[in-house]
């Protein structure tokens, strides 16, 4: 958790809960220390998702969640753009890559994982 000395950061170079909460970014990472090693999770957004790059909800307890519909929650009611109506038979697909790591990856390493994910993505769902 961030309270115990962990770090939250995103693809924009922002760091810390206050700067990353509500930020729109291609990825968000939370890394902390457990005993003598660093561990964490990186969540990577896909360009085909609604509202890419997504808005992120993070907190000091280590919560990290994508929120593609959080425009007005994070930018205020006047921002608009967070409402989406889906037709009854419409299919909505959201793709994210989750990387659980037992290290403290650099921002460049996470960016490379993001680029590999978006360049090689081909998923077929029947």
Question: Where does each model-flagged region fall?
Answer:
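Trp/Gly-enriched beta-strand surface patches
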Residues: 3-79
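Beta-strand-rich recognition/accessory modules
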Residues: 44-126
């Amino acid at each position: 958790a961030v309270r115990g000395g962990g770090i939250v950061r995103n693809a924009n170079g922002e760091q810390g809960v206050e700067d990353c909460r509500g930020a729109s970014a291609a990825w968000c990472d939370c890394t902390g220390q457990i005993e003598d090693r660093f561990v964490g999770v990186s969540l990577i957004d896909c360009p085909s998702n609604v509202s890419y790059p997504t808005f992120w909800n993070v907190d000091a307890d280590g919560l990290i969640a994508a929120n593609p519909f959080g425009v007005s929650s994070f930018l205020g009611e006047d921002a608009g753009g967070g409402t989406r109506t889906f037709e009854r038979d419409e299919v909505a697909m959201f793709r994210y890559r989750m990387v659980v790591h037992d290290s403290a990856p650099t921002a460049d390493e996470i960016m490379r994982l993001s680029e590999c994910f978006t360049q090689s993505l081909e998923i077929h769902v029947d």
